[in-house]
Regions:
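Structured catalytic-domain cores with a bias toward divalent-metal coordination
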Residues: 1-262
């Protein structure tokens, strides 16, 4: 496990990994930054059953998701799931990563800006995914103030969040308090309600215009997704392993559900 020292190293490692495996690397110039948003697309090597996107590095002080996606690319971890196509976004906030801050270099929290195109990094990502049709996505984050994992997980199969948390628990601790980031949480899962209630709640939250990335993707029609929150108060290697475990369990559940449908 090796944490990238800066965004330039992330770019170099992503470029090298993509070239070594013949993956499709797309660069999206970010206005005013002289930097590119990176996207790596990995086609399914067998008959495709699903498309999964993974987003990391929205906040520059949350390194485990970035390490996770770099390992995913460098270690060719997608090969364990040959029927799934992946779209990987290694770091959404280049200047925040270099500064080690939640916000970008202008002090803006990108994860409150996805309702509009005002912030260059957000505008670039919105355009990059506007025409995609992911079956599900992982918005990988960390909670720097926690000692246990939790997730905001929204799936048509209500058993999936619990199963994902169980897989993560094999790698590290799960949150034990009744609240996470001022939201009720039970067994590592932030309360979500049934599908009708969830949609109503989402629309209420979205009314204030301070959208995190999942709200934008929800508005595009993607209904199955999770935000992972690894605990920033424990060692990095464990947090990275927990991120891998959450992603892998989701992929396995997705494949199994598609196989059952055929």
């Amino acid at each position: 496990m090796r944490q990238a020292a800066n965004y330039a190293e992330i770019v170099a490692r992503v470029e090298a990994a993509a070239a070594a495996s013949g993956l499709t690397l797309t660069r999206y110039p970010i206005d005013g930054l002289d930097l590119d948003l990176l996207r790596v697309d990995i086609a399914a090597s067998e008959s495709e059953v699903a498309r999964l996107a993974v987003f990391a590095g929205t906040h520059g002080d949350e390194p485990a998701p970035v390490v996770m996606v770099l390992e995913f690319l460098e270690q060719r971890l997608w090969t364990r799931s040959p029927s799934v196509a992946f779209s990987i976004f290694p770091c959404l906030n280049p200047t925040g990563y270099d500064l080690g801050t939640r916000e970008n270099k202008n002090g803006i929290d990108l994860n409150r800006q996805f309702a509009r195109d005002e912030v260059p990094e957000v505008r670039t990502l919105r355009a990059a995914v506007a025409d995609d049709s992911f079956d599900t996505f992982v918005d990988a984050h960390e909670d720097p103030e926690e000692v246990g994992f939790y997730t905001y997980a929204f799936f048509s199969d209500s058993s999936w969040p619990r199963l994902i948390v169980e897989a993560v628990a094999e790698q590290g601790p799960i949150i034990s308090t009744p609240e996470a980031d001022e939201h009720p949480v039970e067994d590592g899962v932030v309360g979500q309600g049934d599908e009708e209630t969830r949609d109503e709640r989402f629309r209420e939250y979205m009314a204030d215009g301070e959208w995190p990335l999942p709200f934008y993707l929800y508005d595009l029609g993607i209904r199955d997704f999770m935000t992972t929150e690894t605990p920033g108060m424990i060692e990095l290697a464990t947090r990275v392993a927990m991120q891998h475990a959450a992603r892998d369990r989701l992929v396995d559940l997705l494949i199994a559900s598609r196989s059952a449908d055929t």
